[in-house]
């Protein structure tokens, strides 16, 4: 292709891009006008317009629903939007048009640069023709290249043969000096490994109280890495590691012999003995000779820890406690009414639970009252003028522990005395009877039930049904003339 044809193609491309830019600019102007009209349409209800009837004919008309606009989305798809939404859509399309215009301008610049490059090259070629410049030409033979490639492949094979010869030279028998050096290196390596294994064992035994600096100082003082082979014999070392866990004392002795801690050996050898003695002493102190050991069992007979939060403790009836109580108590014959009075010693006037101490005081007081055979006959007696002189059951128990109860407790029963224990017991008895007699009020079920869930025959008298009365016409109803004339006849 000549340079002139190339220039023509570049010029045609530039013209096409410029035409496309002008089309985009025209659409941009149309969008601006459309935005102006959409902004003014909602101002009036029915604006007047000229409706086109073909290319030349128009007639007057009015727009309705100015806020509803159909927008073409593409491929004959439309969507209803308000005027504000359509303005936003048009502005976005306007931005896309600006970006496409900028891209076309950049492409035009690129084409112009190519045109300038081609002109420069064409000028250079014309100048070289006049300067008598000769091109270099060489013959090409594929056979020669193949031979060269074969030679290149043979070179790395030779290098591999040389490496094999060197390896065979290394496999020659070693001298005595080399053997000694290798043995020394192996021994040093074995000693280092032994030292590391000892350090790991010591660290595992020490646990959290392990300090690397202190242990390394002691270890370096006691242990000679360059020692004789007798101290670090492989057979002895392996035998020590293969012993069972049951022989702890023998393992400790061999371990300290290997480490060289001779000073600490007697202390640690007696360590287990001291621990056993301490445990024995603690057991003797904890379990005295005259003390009982209490154990707790579940329903299946298994021992249970009472401190476990997942276990509920249910106190059983112990035989020993019953025997002790029988020795302390005195046999007292009680009537049925007296037994009912004892029932509610655990409740106060308000129905709240009493503490264990208060219940014990009341029971002791009641038994002492039965021993002294206090009369329960109701005798009228004037009320006491001073309420402060009356004594509560607790104060009676505290003050009359040494003296007689008869000096403070009146023999006759007084209903008005609030501090009398007999009145308190009777009130509790009444409260218990009232709670037992309480019944929950249930609403009475209806007598006539429409359907109870059972199948019943139609002609039965189980459900009384009233006959439906016939509708009666209203008194003031108007009749037609035709109907009234027929009735009169």
UniProtKB/Swiss-Prot annotation:
Residues 157-168 have a biased composition (Low complexity). Residues 480-489 have a biased composition (Basic residues). One of its GO terms (biological process) is negative regulation of transcription by RNA polymerase II. It holds the Pfam family Prefoldin. Residues 396-413 have a biased composition (Polar residues). Residues 169-188, 215-224 have a biased composition (Basic and acidic residues). Residues 141-188, 200-329, 396-415, 434-489 are annotated as: Disordered. It is found in: Nucleus. GO terms for molecular function: chromatin binding; phosphatase inhibitor activity; RNA polymerase II complex binding; transcription corepressor activity. One of its GO terms (cellular component) is nucleus. InterPro entries: Prefoldin, Prefoldin_subunit_alpha, RNA_pol_II_subunit5-mediator. The keyword RNA-binding does not apply. Residues 227-265, 276-298, 315-329 have a biased composition (Acidic residues). Belongs to the RNA polymerase II subunit 5-mediating protein family. This is RNA polymerase II subunit 5-mediating protein homolog. It comes from Dictyostelium discoideum. The lineage of its organism: Eukaryota, Amoebozoa, Evosea, Eumycetozoa, Dictyostelia.
């Amino acid at each position: 292709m000549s340079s002139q044809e190339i220039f023509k193609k570049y010029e045609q491309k530039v013209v096409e891009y410029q035409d496309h830019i002008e089309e985009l600019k025209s659409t941009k102007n149309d969008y601006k006008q459309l935005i102006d009209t959409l902004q003014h349409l909602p101002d009036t209800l029915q604006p007047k317009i000229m409706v086109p009837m073909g290319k030349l004919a128009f007639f007057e008309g009015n727009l309705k629903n100015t806020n509803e606009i159909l927008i073409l989305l593409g491929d004959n798809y439309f969507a209803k939007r308000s005027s504000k939404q359509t303005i936003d859509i048009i502005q976005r399309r306007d931005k896309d048009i600006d970006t496409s215009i900028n891209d076309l301008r950049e492409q035009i610049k690129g084409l112009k640069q190519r045109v300038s490059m081609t002109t420069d090259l064409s000028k250079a070629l014309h100048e070289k023709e006049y300067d008598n410049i000769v091109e270099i030409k060489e013959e090409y033979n594929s056979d020669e290249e193949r031979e060269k490639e074969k030679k290149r492949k043979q070179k790395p094979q030779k290098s591999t043969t040389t490496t094999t010869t060197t390896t065979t030279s290394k496999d020659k028998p070693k001298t005595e000096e080399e053997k000694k050096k290798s043995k020394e290196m192996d021994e040093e390596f074995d000693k280092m490994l032994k030292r590391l294994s000892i350090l790991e064992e010591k660290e595992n035994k020490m646990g959290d109280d392990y300090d690397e600096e202190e242990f390394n100082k002691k270890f370096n003082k006691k242990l000679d890495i360059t020692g004789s082979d007798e101290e670090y014999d492989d057979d002895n070392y392996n035998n020590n590691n293969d012993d069972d866990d049951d022989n702890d004392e023998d393992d400790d002795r061999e371990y300290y012999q290997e480490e060289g801690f001779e000073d600490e050996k007697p202390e640690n050898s007696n360590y287990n003995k001291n621990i056993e003695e301490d445990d024995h002493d603690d057991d003797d102190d904890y379990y005295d000779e005259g003390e009982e050991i209490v154990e707790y069992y579940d329903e299946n007979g298994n021992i249970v820890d009472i401190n476990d939060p997942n276990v509920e403790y249910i106190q059983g009836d112990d035989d020993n406690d019953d025997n002790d109580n029988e020795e302390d108590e005195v046999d007292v014959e009680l009537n049925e009414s007296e037994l009912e009075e004892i029932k509610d010693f655990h409740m106060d006037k308000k129905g709240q639970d009493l503490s264990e101490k208060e219940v014990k005081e009341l029971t002791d007081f009641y038994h002492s009252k039965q021993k002294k055979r206090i009369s329960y006959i109701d005798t009228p007696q004037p009320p006491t003028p001073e309420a402060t002189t009356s004594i509560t059951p607790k104060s009676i128990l505290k003050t009359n522990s040494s003296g007689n109860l008869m000096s403070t407790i009146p023999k006759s029963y007084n209903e008005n005395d609030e501090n009398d224990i007999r009145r308190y017991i009777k009130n509790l008895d009444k409260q218990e009877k009232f709670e037992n007699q309480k019944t929950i009020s249930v609403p009475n079920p209806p007598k006539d039930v429409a359907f109870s869930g059972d199948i019943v025959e139609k002609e039965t008298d189980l459900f009384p049904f009233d006959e439906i009365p016939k509708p009666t016409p209203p008194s003031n109803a108007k009749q037609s003339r035709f109907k009234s004339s027929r009735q009169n006849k």
